[in-house]
Amino acid sequence: MLLRNILHIPETHAHFLMPVLQSSGGHQVSMQNTILWNLFIQSIDKLLLYLMTCPQRALWGVTMVQLIAMIYKDQHVNTLQKLLNLWFEASLSESSEDNESNTSPPKKGSGDSSPMLTSDPTSDSSDNGSNGGGSSGKKEGCDERRQALREGTEATLQEVSRKGHDYQNAMARVTADKPDISEVASDSFEVPCSPQQHLNTEEAMDDIDYEEQVQEYEQEAAAVSSEPLNLSQPANNVNYTTNAVYASTTATETQTTSSLCAMTSLCYEPFKPPAPLPTRRNTLSEMLSDNYTSHSHVSAVKLGQKSSHAGQLQLTKGKCCPQKRECPSSQSELSDCGYATQVENPESISTSSNDDDGPQGKPQHQKPPCNTKPRNKQRTLMSPQDKKELRRKKLVKRSKSSLINMKGLVQHTPTNYDISNLLKEFTVDFLLKGYNYLVEELLKQLLTSAKVLIDTSHFFWLVTFFLKLAAQLELDMEHIDSILTYDVLSYLTYEGVSLCEQLELNAQQEGSDLQPYLRRMHLVVTAIREFLQTIETYNKVSHLSEDDRLRLHQLQLQIGATTDLRCLFVLLLRRFNPRIHSKQYLQDLVVTNHILMLILDSAAKLEGGQTIGLSEHISQFATLEVMHYYGILLEDFDNNGEFVNDCIFTMMHHIGGDLGQIGVLFQPIILKTYSR
């Protein structure tokens, strides 16, 4: 409860000055980020997962949900989705090369690996993914993972202390003198491999050599040498400068072969910048001497902001890939626990990393290579089915792993990107090991503990926020089998009707605050949307067992027979009020109703399914008032997205075509959009 209350404290407008950067004029740091960073360094994630799964979890289940909500209050689901996509894409490239020729274990004494890892703590011994066998095997596997989690929790604090000490010694060795090229290169082989690392030999193929990093650093210095450096600029500006410079070097990274040949005599040939200037010094030695002298501190700040491991570039062979600043996602309404409903289409829940507005390339928070073997084979193309299978095996490894995850370094200034990567790691572990237990416990207390005051919005948010990520990862059903149940859907339906009634009563009273009811109402709709969307996603998953498919089959039949769920959206659309409800809420209503119609249509075709009169049900939407609300949403046709517009046109098509009630569509707000 103390941690929950601390994280609930709002940020002040005063600048929080890190002691390390006091000499440079100050650096604005989020106190929330600093607290989270320090908590995860002390392995708060291990403790939380243990408390969620221990037999006494009922005593603090509600408080645990509130703490999780506070941890994620500044995180957007879009950001985590993109980071998880990159995490998967990086592992796919490694696995495809491992399948070609890698049969030898990594060298134990290799110095290319960092002692601080944040991703993929998997063991090759658990590579055989299960297809969801018997229930006894699942129970034994859960017990083994729980025991491994407890053992990992006990050993983590000692490991953190030791590795933090090693990091400080390594940083002192690097920054003691002005390093030349040979010294920096030698430093990259002085850190021993951690015994917990099981890194594949071929991973070095995905990272450029150190000489290419010198070339990138050289181009960065050339780009910024023509303008004065502002050491007191905010963190965002420094990070933006770094991103812009690295984005300009993308073309040079693609010419690996020619770059390696040219770098053999780089120290003796003049450096040629992209736009030569007569007054610019053009030798590598001059550039390195100037930049290590005058810009060493700024470079350290930039590297610290790009990665959770400050100084990692000096110690290991890492990849400095170009980063694009993410566009801020649109927010509509915020819940009590900080969840922001996003304007998204179901297509955005794809597991491919094709988004243009996210960070590209291999993320900095992935594990570095542990091998200097040159690339000798071209990467084989993988089918989508093979990619899904490799990703599934990666998650199976992660769920069975008892290795220690190092989430960061002690002396580091965390940025928002660092915290997002930190929570990406915790999200994977949470979904695999704690999410199922937490939702099950909270629902039990909501249904039985009438005397305990529980904010229902936390339950709605848990379903909305994390079920989207679980569907993206395509977790095995055993990890979400307590969420995808008819009891959960029935409770959401009941709360939807109850909140609609409470909102109507309070709206009639002058001076009453409607925001809590509007937030909960919106979260109920999005929770049902994610529930139904997850069913649609898992119907297309190929690795489900027969028991899991039978469970999904039964759930769809139950949804088809539930008239209250269908009538809920008729009620909510008819009671929509443009004066108090947002357009985002209307969009979520229309999209969720469309997904429900698809499930009802497919449920009627299943074996044992009841005949559902969809035409009779759709006729309840064929009113001037409801179609006027559809017209309000259609006004923003250009920005809605393809799926949202498809939901609108499908309903209008059935009303005007199948039902023949075209008169309800003859409204100025609809005709005006069609006439454009």
UniProtKB/Swiss-Prot annotation:
Compartments, as annotated in UniProt: Nucleus; Cytoplasm, Perinuclear region
Biased composition range(s): Low complexity: 101-129, 360-369
GO cellular component: perinuclear region of cytoplasm; replication fork protection complex
The record's account of how the chain is modified after translation: Phosphorylated with a circadian rhythmicity.
Stretches assigned to coiled coil: none
Span list, region Disordered: 94-145, 346-398
Stretches that traverse the bilayer: none
One GO BP annotation of this record: replication fork arrest
Domain of life assignment: Eukaryota
Main subcellular localisation: nucleus
Region (Necessary for normal circadian rhythm), start-end ranges: 77-108
Domain notes: Contains a 32 AA domain highly conserved between species. Deletion of this domain leads to long-period phenotype and arrhythmia.
Annotated function: Required for the production of circadian rhythms. The biological cycle depends on the rhythmic formation and nuclear localization of the TIM-PER complex. Light induces the degradation of TIM, which promotes elimination of PER. Nuclear activity of the heterodimer coordinatively regulates PER and TIM transcription through a negative feedback loop. Behaves as a negative element in circadian transcriptional loop. Does not appear to bind DNA, suggesting indirect transcriptional inhibition.
Subunit: Forms a heterodimer with period (PER); the complex then translocates into the nucleus.
Family, as annotated: Belongs to the timeless family.
Name of the protein this chain belongs to: Protein timeless
Lineage: Eukaryota, Metazoa, Ecdysozoa, Arthropoda, Hexapoda
Gene coding for it: tim
